[in-house]
Amino acid sequence: MQKEKDVAIVGSGLVGSLLAIFLRKQGHKVTVFDRRPDVRNVQFSGRSINLAMSNRGWKALREAGIEDEIRELALPLDKRAMHVEGQSVYFQKYGEEGEAIYSISRGILNRKMIDLAESAGATFRFEEKIWDVDMKEARLYTGESEKSVWKEYQFDLIFGADGAFSRVRHKMQRQSRFNYSQHFIDVGYKELTILANEDGSHKMDNSSFHIWPRGNFMLIAMPNLDGTFTCTLFMPFDGETSFESIKTEDEADIFFEKYFPDIKDEISNLKKDFFKNPTSAMVTIKCFPWSYFDKITLVGDSAHAIVPFYGQGMNAGFEDISVLNEKMNLYGDDWEKVFEDYQTERKPNADAIAELSYRNFVEMSKKTADPKFLLRKKIEQKFAENHPDLWTPLYSRVTFSDKAYSDALKIGDYQREIMDEVMKIPGIEEKWESSEVEEKIISLIKK
């Protein structure tokens, strides 16, 4: 147990709420600030992709002692359901028997996490906007507007958990030698909903992550506990087939009839929601350093926002908190050492999952309908089943383990080189299950 500190967390999202629980367990006084209203009292905005909880997230929740409460909110998905044009729906298992990702609503999870943090003794101050941060003195200044009278709060430590456009990080960026970059992809997303059947059951398989790959764009759907599915359309902002090109309800109707005829009539209020729900942007943010001496550090998206295509944004943020807690246990009251070790360990892993997430976007939208790519995955899966000591697929290494993201990226690149060679074998389409292919992979691994 550390000596009690008066701690501020800026941001009451998932990562901020989890951090509040860990800090309370360490015996600290915790105040959480958020410029937004209490999410428990507002309707959801139609701007949130469903979350995929995997091993890293569950590990952090287990360490916080709240895993069981959160599992009650989640649905296990053990496979992808691929809705490829001109083909029957087919399924791709994610990993070994019993391995699954878990679909969970961001809004429902956030409400629960705030409840749990409050139960642990954290104080939440909603609709209180941070306008300035005195980094040397660990002071926060809040107010109605930039020109209104500000209120001053004094703390021992401040954690920035306020997302991709963090106010805390914005202040840190004014330091000399603070590195920062942001990159928006030219693809946006829009959320839609498939309602439950009248008896409350799901209209599609509810143990699958559904994907409609269409080249430059795609639709995904994840089930919710209430029988609904949250659908997310990912598509370029501009161009021939884009959000910008669909201007009327009739054009939206024609678009869905052409590309998603099997699901079009199931999407609730399709034409209305397409224009009512916002089209949101996606950004990758990198920065360093994440901490300022023994006073301030960044966690989650405020340190490393990523695109959502590996389902690892929340998991990476939760892993930040797990590692931070590990450093608190290791170094006790030496907060400068806690922060330094935390950022040194997490930075290369954050960069790695950012890269992997972007690559997975290309894979999900463009490659999952490609027969060569699917054959490659089948060969890899079969070899992994026969030789688990020699091969763990990249997806499993990221999703079903808690080994470093940076190692997953490195090993994944090595495996890709091997599979490139394997796919050059003459007649690979006919002999993919043969001992020749298996022996070729083993020989390449042992090179």
From Swiss-Prot:
GO terms for biological process: anthranilate metabolic process; kynurenine metabolic process; L-tryptophan catabolic process; NAD biosynthetic process; quinolinate biosynthetic process. Its cofactor is FAD. It comes from Christiangramia forsetii (strain DSM 17595 / CGMCC 1.15422 / KT0803) (Gramella forsetii). Catalyzes the hydroxylation of L-kynurenine (L-Kyn) to form 3-hydroxy-L-kynurenine (L-3OHKyn). Required for synthesis of quinolinic acid. It comes from the Bacteria. Coiled coil: none annotated. This is Kynurenine 3-monooxygenase. GO terms for molecular function: FAD binding; kynurenine 3-monooxygenase activity. Its EC number is 1.14.13.9. The keyword Oxidoreductase applies. Pathway: Cofactor biosynthesis; NAD(+) biosynthesis; quinolinate from L-kynurenine: step 1/3. Transmembrane segments: none annotated. Keywords: FAD, Flavoprotein, Monooxygenase, NADP, Oxidoreductase, Pyridine nucleotide biosynthesis. Signal peptide: none annotated.
